[in-house]
Amino acid sequence: VSRKITIVGNGEIGEEGAAAIAAADFVIRFNECRSYAASPGRTDVVAVCNTGRPAKAMLSSDTWRTHPAVMEAKEIWSVRDPEKFAGLRAPLAVSHPELGDFCDDYTSHFNAFCKDAGKEHIVVEKVIHEAVDAALATFDPAPYVVPSSGMIAITATFRRFPEVEIGLAGFSHSGWEWHPFAAERQLVDSYIANGRLTRHPADTSLSSSQGA
């Protein structure tokens, strides 16, 4: 029996996306799971930024710890390899001094949270991060700091589930200025074109170039 995975971003979820999430055998959400209200239900993984302010905010929030998606998830994926981010600290101090706490590592805190909550904690290895950087280079991205957690999670899902049908919902490819969202959209579109991914746009009347 073929399994269906849906990766759920925090952008707008349309009817098609909500239906895909409801029909999925495995659902991956992100960070604060902000799109959960529009697509409640199954959650197997919450992928988190385990460095910097997002990590600190989630770990210090009872709202996050008791969020229904976080409660249900069997696994937490930390998308930022501690060794990779330790290596970024010195160059970023020069190029982006305003990101002084960006590489602060909270992996051990997520480890403790998962241990207490009976969840598996998976740290996505830097080889995945570096594979994403290499794939994005094809699209000549503007200078960026790191790929988005969504792009890391998509690539990690490919590696873990090589033959499984994977759909995307709630991906707007927009947000923090130092993620390479334009190149990420092009990369995702290339995966869709070769049949590796399916996109469930928020508005099915939009063309693929404008959709989620």
Which residues make up each language-model segment?
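Metal-ion/cofactor- or nucleotide/acyl-coenzyme-handling active-site neighborhoods
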Residues: V1-A212
